Amino acid sequence: MAKRKEVTEISEMDIKKSGFVNRLYRETCDISNKYIKFDDDGDKLIIPNKIDFIKKALNKISSTKDYSSFVRQLNNYGFTKIKLDNGDSNCDIYYHQNFHRDHPDLISLITRDKSKNGDYKDNMTTFINSLQYLASCNYKQQKEINDLKDRIKTLETKYATLYEIISNAFRQGIEQYQKHNTMYFNNNSLLKNMFTYNQELDDLKDNTNVYNNAKLINQLKLDAKNSNQDDNIKKTKNAFDEFYF
């Protein structure tokens, strides 16, 4: 919250010009006076509680004890009442383009029109101040809009960068996953091929053993047959020998 500025020295000439406005500025700047103050930006006059203001601070600014008379004085000097959004009827806010906490040099420009057409002039002054207030509000709103645009642009840049980082990380994750699956598939295929080869080798060994066993059996059979034939020949020969001799 902005600090309220200390009371600035006001020349006697300024006091003679407008004692009411200078007293108003002095009390509004006085940090010990909580019944009337500037807003945070220092460009609007705030009376937080009208009842407390009438009891504690009105007599320091105006000779009247009537709040309506005090408001008329503000209107005569061109102050514009600002409508509150919250509808608090016990709080009043006023604006004047030359009544600013940080620009006491502008106070001398706040004057009361004393011409015959005073009512018209006062209304014009109030109207001009209202336009000035609207222009000030529009400027602030435009500044806020520009600030929001800058923030949105910054957020969009950060979002794009973050999106790119996440996309790259996701893409790398997919690539690693695919590489892992490929290696896993290759390893499985290799193990499967090795298992098949070993199985085929075992089968081949079994078949070889069977073949060798069969061959051995056939050889044994053949040897046995040959042996029988030899025995028969010997027997025949012996018989022949016995017959002739």
Curated annotation (Swiss-Prot):
Gene3D superfamilies: Winged helix-like DNA-binding domain superfamily/Winged helix DNA-binding domain. Keywords: Activator, DNA-binding, Nucleus, Stress response, Transcription, Transcription regulation. It is found in: Nucleus. Signal peptide: none annotated. Residues 17-115 bind DNA. SMART domains: HSF. It comes from the Eukaryota. One of its GO terms (cellular component) is nucleus. One of its GO terms (molecular function) is sequence-specific DNA binding. InterPro entries: HSF_DNA-bd (IPR000232), WH-like_DNA-bd_sf (IPR036388), WH_DNA-bd_sf (IPR036390). Residues 130-169 are annotated as: Involved in trimerization. SUPFAM superfamilies: Winged helix' DNA-binding domain (SSF46785). Its main location: nucleus. DNA-binding transcription factor that specifically binds heat shock promoter elements (HSE) and activates transcription. Homotrimer. Homotrimerization increases the affinity of HSF1 to DNA. Belongs to the HSF family. This is Heat shock transcription factor.
